[in-house]
Amino acid sequence: MKMTSKKMKDELIKKLSRPEWDFQYDSEKEVLRIEQKDSKKGINVSLPGVVAKWEVNKEKAIEEVAYYVQEALIAMHKEENSGAKILPVIRSTSFPKQAEEGNPFIMTDHTAETRIYYALDSNKTYRLIDERLLQKLELTEQQVREMALFNARSLGYEFKQDTVAGNTFYFLNTNDGYDATRILNESLLQSMREKISGDMVVAVPHQDVLIIADIVNEIGYDIIAQMTMKFFAEGHVPITSLSFVYEDGEFEPIFILAKNRKKTDGKEKG
């Protein structure tokens, strides 16, 4: 049987059919939206991607996508009823891993320098989610991650821009406590990548700033290094003084690239 986006849509609707959920199919974009009838919150599933997974894993691919959608929608419903939002926050890898002895935080690896934690935000205060709080919330770690990333994508962004020696720097500083969190918004990163002509360099020196730079020369690398160090030193919640080159969805710390460059230069001289 040849699988198509339309057939995949039918398979997913069959798996996810519940009286409290609605389905909308955009045949032009090949996207299936599953949302809660009451809140209209939901998830968009790009069907060509699922079809590609099906070509390799067959039924398992459908089961996997259906499971993640179901987990995320259930978690959203619980979050809505609790009156608090769950959002990811970026922290240094040196940040404590436990709230107290025997009670670890819920965490996800991010880069060599950063780690993702999860915050329960009730507008006035927020608390990092640890295992005990997770049990009280009656959520799984996967539900927390899905919900947090969904909420991160809904955070607005408006950059200030500055150009120095041909290099363009974009600054996000809303002071909502989640500026660095925007680094997890893939669609934001991709849209910036499309407008950048040189190397795309990203920095989160502290939690209240995100810097994205279009670096076209060595001066640009010097400027971003100095800038990141300055912001890191001034930050209320410092994260990392290193910046990263962003390419193909991956973050590479600049000092690693510099080391590799030196090794290459050394070989050429030899």
Curated annotation (Swiss-Prot):
InterPro entries named among the record's database cross-references: DUF1444
The record's Pfam families line, in alphabetical order, gives: DUF1444 (PF07285)
Q: Which domain of life is it from?
A: Bacteria
Q: Which family does it belong to?
A: Belongs to the UPF0354 family.
**UniProt-recorded name of the protein:** UPF0354 protein BC_4690
Q: Which organism is it from?
A: Bacillus cereus (strain ATCC 14579 / DSM 31 / CCUG 7414 / JCM 2152 / NBRC 15305 / NCIMB 9373 / NCTC 2599 / NRRL B-3711)
